[in-house]
Amino acid sequence: KLEPFTAFRNYHSVGKVGRIHQDVNSIENGVSYQMYRDFDSLHMQVSKEAHFMPTFEWNYDNEYLRELDRGYDFKEDLLTPGYFSMLMHPGEEIVFSAGTSELVPSQLQSLFASELKNRKKITDFESALDIAAEQFISETKKGTEITAGFHWFGRWGRDTFISLPGLTLSRKQPHVCKSVMNTMLQDLRDGLLTNVGAGEEARYNSADASLWFFWSLQKYAAHTKNTKGLWVEFGDRIKEIVESYRKGTWYNIHMTEDGLLWGGQEDVALTWMDAMV
């Protein structure tokens, strides 16, 4: 008997008892379930033929001790949509999968074995850093991105470029460094790179994200020793940023007569840690 507990919520919050959908759709060796209308369906499958019994039972007041220590809301109600029942023999292994897309159950065993094989082992402090660094790099629909922090943050412009050389160049991955820069440049607007978000959800309240991009670019150039090729690929964007800062851009960011940069707008945080100066 396998009984999954589900939350269906943003990582900034905890789930509470509410009105939910009480129907599941059968898929191969499992079910798909959409708890709320605006949420993606959760596909739950097992590697062996099983019977799923819907129950829709709430498990109240699950406590998270780390949140308690931090003074956050630490109690959550978790829903059990139902349970899987199957016959297992001594020593038999069953693989369970849960995700936003349906998988092929007959491949779950091999997928799980492949994942275990590909995982790097921590043998010393350097390998621990290498594994940790890899976890911050992800492939998205936009391209290659860096997560600013688990699990509260997504993509942040300033954090991306501050960390980029260490996460990529120090690990001999200049191609990843270049890919991240190209991904971020997709959202360049009037010389500014995003503070947070991308596309229509991008926010540009950062006076220094573009400047940190220059710093990362310098590190990339020093690592690859290909300044001519760098200028061919990034030269137009470099000039766009410099010219925008020189003439003036959003949030009153501009170059003063003495060649220094100045920026600021009431009630808009443009600097590190959302400080308003």
Place the predicted regions along the sequence by residue:
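Acidic, mature catalytic/reactive cores of soluble proteins
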Residues: 1-277
